[in-house]
Amino acid sequence: MGAWGQGGLASPTMTAPLARPTTSLSGGVGVAAHSPATAAAGMALLDAGGTAADAAVGMTLAACAVEPFVVSLLSGLHGIHVDVDGTTRAVDGFVDVPAVPTGGRRAETTIDFGGARMPYSIGGATFGTPGLVAGCWHLHRRFGRLPWAEVVAPAIEWAGTGFVLSDRDESLLHMLEPVMTLGVGREVFCIDDRMRVEGELVRIPDLADALRQIAEEGGPTLYEGAMSRELATFAQEVGALVTAEDLGACTAVEHTPPTVRLGGWQVRSRRGLSPLTDWVARLDASDGPHAARLALAQSPTPPKALGTTSLAATDTDGRACAVTASLGLGTGDWFRGSQLNSMLGEVDLLVGGLRPRTRMGSMMAPTAVVSPTGQATVLGAAGGSRIPSALLRTIDGIVLGELDATAAVDLPRIHRVGELVHVEPHLEDRDEAALVAAGFTVQRWTSRHHFFGGVSVAGAAGTQGDPRRGGVGLAHR
């Protein structure tokens, strides 16, 4: 019996006992996500009596249907959950290195980031063992209340009806054209020999059926069930290295995240490749002009990473849950409506090389901030190497600036790359002068931009998606 059969993990309806409320979420009950459709899925589950984890899991699965440029069922995730008694747990459902990590079929491509062209590896050999469904299953089993099939239902509905491309979607699609138009992607994202544009309907074949199977058989079907055998066969056909044994060995890992202090608050977040907790500690210990402190708290970060979404939810009992999920660029191969992740081709994540059957590193860092009075807010960010700086700025606004979620997300972002600091418009002149005085070269952007990442916030500070990434927040007041 594999790891999925241990400790009752094979039961799709098993959930953990729910604790009694002691935390406060004065900002209201709601969700935040990068897509209105994703947010709607989470809100429907809250309306049905679901927990924050139910909503977060449902949104993650729905995002696989309506945000296919950045996430799929064959991706990885990181999550954080704050229970009603304040207990905070992190869940790692990211991507594993397969047992045989080298060989296979690989291709090289280039992505144009608005004038900066960067090389990427794609193809089957870049596919890592996907932990997203394992992470969703674990979050639901530990912290959910609704039946599993009900949590998956909104994703099935969106996969069946399709979604209308937004202007942000069109921009992403055109940027990712070299991989999104391969294989099944050409059928999905092109029409009459051209790429689809804003306002046109996109529906991914076979995804609804795959989601129905996961709803009926539970998350383990992707790892030790019928679907796992299909996926292992498909992986071999496309030159991937993931085997049935690799899938069976992939499980979510739960742990207590480290805590650092900031202005009397507790900031709880994972480490791994994320430097966020170190940056928060530096910010708390430093003095001087605020903008310079924000930049000095940061350290040089990897230059590239693609394909991420973030979401957050709070429920009526005071629980909060945030998830960040990532596809990477994608391999260009599609299995039953889901593109394979390309994490083995993300060189920035391969710290220490490809070690067989190990969990890959990630910059993703869903985070909880808890006030001195016990009020909790969760947040996560998308944006590759800009994830920590986007979170740091938003946490700074909530904790030190005493701002609500909307105002904190709206703050001009500051992102350091070596001695160069990228800043968004509307940063005050005195703050820019402080950066220059601290020895930084300042590059001021002319408009608020998705380059600076997208933050989703829910909890005591309020509910807010990030307009830089087309995000929305929905709340019951």
Protein language model features and the residues they cover:
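Noncatalytic scaffold domains of N-terminal-nucleophile
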Residues: 2-44, 50-217, 222-224, 229-267, ...
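Active-site rim segments in enzyme catalytic domains, especially the processed small/beta chain
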Residues: 65-69, 76-82, 87-90, 243, ...
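Short Gly/Pro-enriched turn/cap motifs at secondary-structure boundaries
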Residues: 69, 125-126, 301-304, 355-361, ...
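Short beta-strand scaffold segments in enzyme catalytic cores
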Residues: 71-83, 258, 309-314, 320-322, ...
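N-terminal accessory/precursor segments of enzymes
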Residues: 90-142, 266-287, 360-415
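C-terminal catalytic domains of large/alpha subunits in multi-subunit enzymes
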Residues: 249-253, 290-305, 315-316, 369-373, ...
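Short, small/polar residue-rich loop motifs at catalytic or cofactor-binding pockets
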Residues: 254, 305-308, 362-364
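Internal maturation/activation junctions in enzymes
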Residues: 265, 271-326, 336, 445
